[in-house]
Structure formats: C-alpha cells, structure tokens
C-alpha cells in the first residue's frame, strides 16, 4: 500500500472509532499486560479528557497517540502506528501534532517513558529533541502493593 502523507488526517479520536483503535493497539502492543486492555483504557481515558489523537488515511485508522496533561507537563502515553504504515512519516506527524495540541492548552514540557532496551523507539524520540533525563521511574499496582 502506497501511503500519501499529504492525504492523512490527524485529529482527536471520535466515539465510534473504538474498534479501530483497539485493533491498532492490539497489533502494535501484542504483549501488553491485562491491565492495559485497550477497551477499558480508552473508556477510562475519555472519562478524564479527550487527549487521544488519531491518524486517518483513506478512511482507515493507521496511527494513534494517547496523551496527558497535568496543568504543567504533558505526557505521551502510547504512540502507535500500524506496522504497514511505519517509516513513512506517520509517527513523526502524529507526535508533532500531539505536541502542538498540548502546547495550545498550556503545556511547557512533554515527558514520555519507554523501555530502556527499546533503542529504535529511543532514537525516534531523540530525533525530536527529547533527551534522557536523570530520573528513576517507579510504579506500584494499587490494591496489590499500595
């Protein structure tokens, strides 16, 4: 499939696109743990805000980014591009669009987390000007550890 990036539409996710987004996330993140089940994550996210952005090309959802904003910092939580649409500028356009949208609501800094072993994705974000910061990321499951 030849991708025409000039015909891509990048916008906020719309209700009714759930199945397309779920299918994309299952394709891109096949080994996600059960607590990251896409349908419940989407539902929970939309109860908080609408910071889910999608890329549509020829009527097909080929990319998505779930973002967050705490009133100061923004976050890129999940960036996904269908495997057949990668290395064609989709992810770059999506990340730039998401950062622009975050800036428009007052965001002054954008953060993200990736696995330290994921060198390909690390290089992708470094190319935007992200840098590795001296931070320690911690997490605990509510109800199990807390």
Residue ranges and their predicted role:
Residues 79-86:
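A short, internal acetyl-CoA/4′-phosphopantetheine-binding micro-motif in the GNAT/acyltransferase core
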Residues 1-16, 145-146:
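Conserved N-terminal entry element of GNAT/NAT acetyltransferase domains
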Residues 112-121, 143:
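Conserved beta-strand-loop-alpha-helix junction that forms the acyl-donor binding cleft
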Residues 102-114:
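Conserved GNAT acetyl-CoA-binding A-motif
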Residues 87-100, 127:
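Conserved acetyl-CoA-binding loop-helix of GNAT-fold acetyltransferases
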Residues 128, 135-144:
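Active-site/acyl-donor-binding loops of N-acyltransferases
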Residues 12-78, 101, 132-135:
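Acetyl-CoA-dependent GNAT
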């Amino acid at each position: 499939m030849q991708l025409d990036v000039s015909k891509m539409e990048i916008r906020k996710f719309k209700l009714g696109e759930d199945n397309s987004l779920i299918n994309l996330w299952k394709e891109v993140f096949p080994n996600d743990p059960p607590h990251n089940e896409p349908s419940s994550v989407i539902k929970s996210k939309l109860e908080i805000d609408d910071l889910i952005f999608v890329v549509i090309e020829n009527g097909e959802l080929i990319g998505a980014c779930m973002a967050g904003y705490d009133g100061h910092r923004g976050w890129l939580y999940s960036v996904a591009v269908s495997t057949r649409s990668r290395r064609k500028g989709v992810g770059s356009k999506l990340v730039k669009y998401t950062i622009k949208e975050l800036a428009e609501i007052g965001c002054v800094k954008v953060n993200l987390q990736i696995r330290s072993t994921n060198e390909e994705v690390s290089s992708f974000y470094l190319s935007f000007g992200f840098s590795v910061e001296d931070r320690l990321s911690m997490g605990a499951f509510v109800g199990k550890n807390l």
